[in-house]
């Protein structure tokens, strides 16, 4: 058996002993959405530390637990604190939680994050729906022997972000009168913020926002046949767009200020997605 698949299986079996909850939607909380899980109808909470072999987030503001419960009547599995490649984990460990949530039953992966705005039309506090991504600067989570249990060797990436889910997000934002931006997200390895020259490069190849997560998670989910959507909170202008130095604290504070509106948008999206799953 493939070692990576074996590790995911072992984690899955441990979680199944703790709960028989079956989610429809897997939600990954980025900066600014940290306390969202506390506002749902909670069924079970599982700390990452309780799962032997599971990677644990070391980033300030990322709690490190799964919260399973209901948004309205839609069963969701929330990842409260993702792990990042820059923390020293292998890429297979970075996406292990995504694979686990799929094995738990999730059909949709809803990704959120805080990012730096590259597009000149973006301001701190804006929300960008991710319509495409660039992941060429971090290792693919699919490198190595293919895990046949998850998917095929060469998965298509033409429509990685589901168009029907994008329409759901548009309608949700319109209903809440939230100005929704759209664009391409690029993942760079981090943990250092990007240089102005790197941001100019990102802009030249078509990126609108930059961060240190998300794209690799989408690749793993796409490999397994999940429907994927994503919203990025623009926390700050990227390096060179503004002359102000970048700090993690500033990113966190900006994301926290946008949190109430972000949480309303996420809830509205999940409710609408849940209705579409029932059809």
Show which residues each predicted segment covers.
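Metabolite-binding pocket within alpha/beta catalytic cores that recognizes anionic/polar moieties
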Residues: 1-157
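Histidine/lysine/aspartate-rich catalytic loop segments that bind and position anionic ligands
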Residues: 134, 138, 142-191
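Active-site/ligand-binding-proximal alpha/beta "capping" segment
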Residues: 166, 172-208, 266, 273-277
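Short acidic/polar active-site loop segments enriched in Thr and Asp
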Residues: 107-108, 208, 227
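Non-catalytic positions within long, well-ordered alpha-helices that form the structural scaffold/packing
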Residues: 102-105, 203, 222
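His/Asp/Glu-rich mid-to-C-terminal helical/loop segments that flank catalytic regions of hydrolases
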Residues: 239-279
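Zn-dependent metallopeptidase/amidohydrolase metal-coordination segment
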Residues: 212-250
């Amino acid at each position: 058996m493939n070692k990576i698949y074996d590790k995911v299986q072992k984690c899955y079996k441990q979680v199944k002993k703790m709960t028989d909850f079956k989610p429809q939607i897997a939600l990954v909380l980025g900066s600014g959405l940290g306390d969202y899980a506390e506002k749902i109808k909670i069924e079970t909470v599982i700390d990452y530390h309780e799962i032997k072999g599971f990677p644990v987030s070391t980033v300030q503001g990322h709690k490190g637990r799964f919260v399973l419960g209901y948004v309205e009547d839609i069963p969701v599995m929330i990842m409260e604190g993702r792990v990042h490649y820059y923390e020293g984990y292998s890429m297979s460990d970075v996406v292990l939680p995504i694979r686990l949530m799929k094995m738990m039953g999730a059909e949709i992966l809803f990704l959120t994050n805080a990012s730096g705005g590259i597009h000149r039309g973006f301001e701190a506090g804006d929300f960008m729906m991710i319509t495409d991504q660039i992941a060429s600067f971090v290792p693919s989570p699919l490198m190595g022997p293919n895990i046949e249990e998850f998917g095929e060797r060469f998965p298509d990436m033409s429509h990685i972000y589901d168009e029907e889910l994008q329409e759901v997000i548009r309608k949700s934002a319109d209903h809440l009168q939230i100005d929704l931006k759209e664009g391409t997200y690029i993942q760079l390895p981090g943990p250092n913020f990007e240089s102005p020259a790197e941001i100019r490069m990102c802009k030249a190849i078509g990126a609108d926002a930059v961060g240190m997560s998300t794209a690799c998670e989408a690749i793993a989910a796409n490999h397994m046949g999940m429907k994927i959507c994503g919203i990025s909170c623009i926390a700050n202008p990227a390096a060179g767009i503004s002359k102000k130095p970048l700090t993690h604290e500033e990113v966190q504070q900006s994301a926290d200020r946008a949190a109430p509106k972000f949480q309303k948008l996420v809830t509205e999206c999940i409710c609408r997605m849940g209705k579409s799953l029932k059809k």
